[in-house]
From Swiss-Prot:
SUPFAM superfamilies named among the record's database cross-references: NagB/RpiA/CoA transferase-like
Protein name, as recorded: 5-formyltetrahydrofolate cyclo-ligase
UniProt keyword terms in alphabetical order: Acetylation, ATP-binding, Cytoplasm, Folate-binding, Ligase, Magnesium, Metal-binding, Nucleotide-binding
GO molecular function: 5-formyltetrahydrofolate cyclo-ligase activity; ATP binding; folic acid binding; metal ion binding
Enzyme class: ligase
The enzyme's E.C. designation: 6.3.3.2
Native source species: Mus musculus (Mouse)
Amino acid sequence: MAAVTVNSAKRGLRAELKQRLRALSAEERLRQSLLLTQKVIAHNQYQNSKRISIFLSMQDEVETEVIIKDIFKQGKICFIPRYQFQSNHMDMVRLTSSEEIALLPKTSWNIHQPGEGDVREEALSTGGLDLIFLPGLGFDKDGNRLGRGKGYYDTYLKRCVQHQEVKPYTMALAFKEQICPQIPVDEHDMKVDEVLYEDSPAS
């Protein structure tokens, strides 16, 4: 598929998925989020991972708060994204406790993240990551992901491959309404190892 056609298909699908997400009630988002939280906590890949990066969820994303609390409860090491808004660069920086999140400044996207001057341990320079949880707008069952168009995660996953001997396991968290028959992709798009949603097969 030509690049122009792929970009056009992505734009159309993003608009459709945003509409689907807007139609989801708060109760339904919470119901699916709690179900996915249980799936994550029972997942072998999660249980066997020590260094984990996870996104702080926006309103239209699977809620990650309980998973973050469990990461600390299990004695694992938690990293969260710090986006650079003037580029597509993102680092995963260490979070010291789940309670700390509320104290972090908010971005223009209304999500908390450590400020630029806040010096923190960065995952790739201190041993890498075992597991990365990814958000996104849409996914298919082959692991193709449609993000919001900035390229943060695709760029970061390529850096992981360069910096780590063993590639981190990547797991997307999705509402079932975000699962599509096929996601349009180009050569820059990175697949995820597993898409977790309400009806996804048990691992």
